[in-house]
Each structure stands twice: as structure tokens, then as C-alpha cells.
């Protein structure tokens, strides 16, 4: 049964939605104890806004659709924009994962996530689609920024494909990947990072997965093009992180200012 508090969070978030967004839910009638709650969550989203177009499929019975969306586990929510951009969320939607999905809906419907220009321009050099998986816990606030970066990069570049996975719901996956620390991020098929991942580290791991940089002579930074033993040189990493931190500080100031004005107006 879906908690009333969860329904309220969904209503408050999706009620003001102004642009259409498609949510595709994949479930299974067998072997999925959490799928009924996923269906209730999806219905609550549909009820919260007429702008939500909801489609539901069975991962086995609708194999053509699950193949089309690249779905490998249930339940999985695919949040899709009209231009084809898509983010997947697998597992029980509550806490951190629910907030991430709701934020993703708004990003797809309106303003895209902000990233330093050096990251956006460098991402254009990716030659193939790189799948990114972020494993997290719903009560892990430290997991949220990592997942936000992965989601944001996928929304800003067609060569990045992101899936957010609630780790506790898939013990076999945890065992296969030998996960010990969350968040746990997988780039491509084999590259992994534990814990916090900065924007510049994300960029570096994406290009490692892309295999654009071969070992040997004349290895250069993918951002500035200068000779460097790493895919992103130390100088560019510092500049990217400084720009990202400054942007976050400005956002926090604007948020604090808005809260103060709201308190004054209602006082």
C-alpha cells in the first residue's frame, strides 16, 4: 500500500507540471514482490498531473518493449522526453530515488541541469553511447548528488545513458558487482567507482569507458588538449570543480533568499 505521505510528495511535485512527460513502467506478475507498489506509485503520478502519459508493460510478455527500452530488471520506471532522452529508475521508489525521479520529470519538462561549459563541450567528443548505473540506498543523502550528476549528464548528452538502481532490491546484482560501499557507480561494462564522484571524475570515467584514449605516446587531456598522463588534466579538474562549486553556492543563496522572502510574506 502506498503511503499517504508519498502520494502527497508526488502531488506537490507534479501538480504544477506544464509540459508533457512520458513514464513507462515495466513490471512482472511473477517473482516481483515490490511490483504492486510500483504500479500504485505510477498511478499516483498519473493522477497528480494530466501532463503525465503513463504506459505499463510486462518485462516478459512485452519483450519487444523491454528490449526497446533496454530494461533488465523489474520494477523499472523509464522517464522519457519527446526528443527521446530517457532516464531509468529501478527498484522501490521512495526517499532519495523518488525525489530523483520527480526532479528528472521536471528537468525533462523544462530547464535542463547545469554543468560547467568545459564538461558540456568535451562530452560532444564521445563516440558511442556509454551506459552509467548508480546504485544507491533510499535513505542515503550522500548518494543523491552522485545520481544527480549521472542523470544530468544523460539529459544533456545523447551518448550518456543513466539508470538509477535501488541497491537493496537487487541482491544478486550487488553480489555480481561486489558492491561494498554506496553509492556505487558503473561506467560502461567494467569501470566502477565507490562513494562520491565529482563532475570531473565522471567526465574522465566516461572517456575511459569510451576507449578514446589508448595507452602510449601523445596522451592528451580531453578538455584542453594539452599533454597529460590522465584523461582530464589536474588543471582542468580544478577549474571544473571550482566552477561547479561556485554555481552551487549561487543556487543556495537564491534558495535561501526565496525562503526568506516567503517567510516574510506569510509572517
Describe the function of each predicted region:
Residues 1-22, 96-128:
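N-terminal leader/targeting and pre-domain segments
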Residues 6, 10-49, 123-158:
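Local sequence-structure signature of Cys/Sec-based thiol-disulfide redox active-site neighborhoods
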Residues 50-64, 158-172:
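Thiol-based oxidoreductase modules, predominantly thioredoxin-like and allied folds used
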Residues 66-73, 173-182, 191-197:
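Thiol/disulfide oxidoreductase modules built on the thioredoxin-like
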Residues 78-113, 181, 186-215:
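Non-catalytic, surface beta->alpha helical segment in thiol-disulfide oxidoreductase systems
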Residues 140, 218-224, 233-236:
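Short cysteine-rich clusters marking metal-coordination/redox-active sites
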Residues 227-229, 241:
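Short functional micro-motifs and their immediate structural scaffolds
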Residues 235-248:
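Short Cys/His-rich micro-motifs in 6-15 aa windows
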Amino acid at each position: 500500500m502506498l503511503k499517504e505521505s508519498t502520494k502527497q510528495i508526488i502531488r506537490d511535485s507534479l501538480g504544477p507540471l506544464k509540459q508533457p512527460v512520458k513514464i513507462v513502467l515495466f513490471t512482472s506478475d511473477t517473482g516481483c514482490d515490490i511490483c504492486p507498489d510500483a504500479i500504485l506509485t505510477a498511478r499516483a503520478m498519473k493522477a497528480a498531473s494530466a501532463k503525465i502519459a503513463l504506459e505499463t508493460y510486462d518485462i516478459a510478455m512485452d519483450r519487444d518493449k523491454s528490449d526497446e527500452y533496454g530494461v533488465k530488471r523489474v520494477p523499472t520506471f523509464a522517464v522519457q522526453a519527446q526528443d527521446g532522452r530517457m532516464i531509468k529508475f529501478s527498484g522501490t521508489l521512495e526517499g532519495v530515488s523518488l525525489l530523483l525521479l520527480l526532479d528528472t520529470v521536471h528537468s525533462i519538462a523544462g530547464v535542463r541541469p547545469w554543468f560547467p561549459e568545459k564538461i558540456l563541450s568535451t562530452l560532444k567528443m564521445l563516440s558511442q553511447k556509454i551506459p552509467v548505473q548508480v546504485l544507491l540506498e533510499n535513505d542515503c543523502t550522500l548518494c543523491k548528488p552522485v545520481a544527480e550528476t549521472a542523470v544530468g549528464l544523460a539529459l544533456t548528452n545523447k551518448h550518456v545513458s543513466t539508470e538509477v538502481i535501488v541497491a537493496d532490491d537487487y541482491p544478486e546484482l550487488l553480489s555480481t558487482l561486489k558492491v561494498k560501499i554506496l553509492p556505487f557507480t558503473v561506467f560502461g561494462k567494467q569501470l566502477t567507482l565507490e562513494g562520491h564522484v565529482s563532475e570531473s571524475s565522471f567526465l574522465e570515467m566516461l572517456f575511459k569507458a569510451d576507449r578514446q584514449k589508448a595507452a602510449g605516446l601523445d596522451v592528451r587531456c580531453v578538455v584542453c588538449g594539452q599533454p597529460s598522463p590522465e584523461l582530464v588534466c589536474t588543471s582542468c579538474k580544478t577549474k571544473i570543480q571550482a566552477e561547479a562549486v561556485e554555481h552551487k553556492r549561487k543556487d543556495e543563496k537564491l534558495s535561501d533568499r526565496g525562503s526568506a522572502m516567503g517567510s516574510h510574506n506569510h509572517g
